[in-house]
Regions:
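Active-site rim elements
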Residues: 20-21, 75, 95, 251-256, ...
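Beta-strand-rich binding/interaction modules
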Residues: 1-5
Length: 418
């Protein structure tokens, strides 16, 4: 509506920065946005669904506000045991789309039988939270509580999770808390670094934080407002969408401090673990840090050395037998003498990921092998992946021996390569 039609919110008495409004609304579907004094219009920073820049909600017969009225079917589902996980990382668009089309949650549902037949019991989704525009890998995150509208509706995402659960497949969400784009309503609602509690200058480093935001805004994880906001978002995904866990991106750039365990990475991972100890809480913390995983509520970290030593082997840079046994077969990171991970379930090991192209491509490009030779040798590396200690993860299309790391000329999955 027009500015003149806007409803004025009230400031809570005795509470800092709390504004509220109470409305008598009948059951139905609604859209709303915030109108700031400077004329800026914003969706809710805790939106579940955003359509054309506005928050969309459903008011139920009991007065509750949700993104939809989805009815769950997989109520008997039990999460796979941690030591049985075989994780499959995929990007909704690239995995499901063909040609010049765009992939959606429904397209992923159509391929769940393929994943189940391949022995997959956990899917790690690259970011599916709201980002600017219609095509992205999702690491330019905008609203981490909202489903990316180009992939489908909240109800369709719930159907994906529900259907996966009926097949015994867990869903792990990739979440990006290190940074946000400047169009995020969490920033736009107070675009002043000195006044907005959720952000800081990227050069103002917190304990154990490395600078790196890829040109986006740096989230301040040592502010209790931030920790509270992150936990509220996590609870949305756990409570309303029934996700089984999270993979947290770029946590080396977040910061942590054992003397301040309620803040930083330790703060919101411990809140999540305390809320539901059965959740998978995994981190991409590179360079990897076994000590951090072993002394926190984090379930597991990406095992960087596993990939690196296999890549060395592909390039003909052969490691010593001790290095291979320590860092590939064993649970060491980067060194044969440091303290390794305590348990195999504390590492996520992989040959390929969204950041690392396929070893088949490496063998063709760097070792001069034919595609058939590379695929045959790739089976040797896959044997190591599935027989060494740790939780194996494969990248979309890897099970079919795709050379290209999945992408065709349109950036989509090329199932014809199968």
């Amino acid at each position: 509506g027009s500015d003149a039609e806007a409803l004025v919110m009230k400031k809570a008495t005795g509470l800092e920065d709390i504004w509220w409004i109470e409305l008598d609304m009948s059951a139905g579907e609604y859209e709303y946005e915030y109108l700031l004094l400077n004329g800026t219009r914003l969706p809710d920073p805790l939106s579940r669904r955003v359509i054309n820049g506005k928050t969309r909600v459903v008011i139920g017969s009991g007065g509750g506000s949700t993104a939809d009225d989805y009815q769950w079917q997989s109520n008997e589902y039990i999460r796979p045991a941690l030591d049985t996980l075989i994780i499959y990382e995929l990007h909704v668009d690239d995995f499901a789309a063909q040609g010049s089309g765009q992939g959606h949650f429904n397209d992923v549902i159509a391929r769940l039988d393929h994943l189940q037949a391949a022995g997959i019991n956990a899917i790690e989704l690259m970011p599916v939270t709201e980002f600017p525009g219609g095509r992205s890998w999702g690491y330019n995150n905008q609203i981490l509580s909202a489903v990316e509208s180009s992939y489908g509706t909240p109800a369709e995402f719930k159907e994906l999770i529900d259907t996966a659960h009926e097949k015994g497949i867990a869903i792990i969400m990739d979440m990006v808390w290190n940074h946000m784009v400047s169009s995020s309503p969490l920033w736009q609602i107070q675009p002043d670094m000195n006044l907005n509690p959720y952000f800081k200058n990227s050069s103002d480093l917190n304990p154990n934080e490395v600078e790196g935001t890829w040109g986006m805004l740096d989230v301040d994880h040592f502010n209790p407002y931030t920790v509270d906001y992150i936990h509220r978002v996590h609870r949305i995904w756990v409570d309303e969408y029934r996700v089984d866990g999270f993979r947290f991106d770029a946590t080396r750039f977040v910061g942590w401090d054992m003397n301040q365990p309620e803040l930083g990475l330790l703060g919101w991972t411990s809140l999540l673990h305390d809320y539901d100890p059965s959740l998978y809480i995994t981190i991409e913390h590179l360079a990897a840090d076994p000590w951090l995983v072993m002394n926190s509520d984090i379930t597991a970290g990406w095992h960087d050395s596993f990939h690196d030593r296999l890549l060395d082997h592909v390039h003909g840079n052969y490691s010593s037998a001790m290095t291979f046994m320590s860092q590939v077969v064993g649970l060491h990171e980067y060194s044969n003498w440091d303290d390794p991970y305590d348990y195999p379930t504390q590492v996520i090991k992989y040959m390929v990921s969204h950041d690392e192209q396929s070893l088949i491509q490496e063998m063709v490009q760097w070792a001069g092998l034919t595609i058939d030779q590379a695929r045959e040798k790739d089976k040797f590396y896959a044997t190591i992946l599935f027989t060494s200690r740790g939780t194996p993860m494969i990248w979309q299309g890897q099970e079919l021996g795709f050379q290209s790391g999945w992408l065709d000329d349109n950036g989509n999955g090329n199932w014809d390569e199968e």
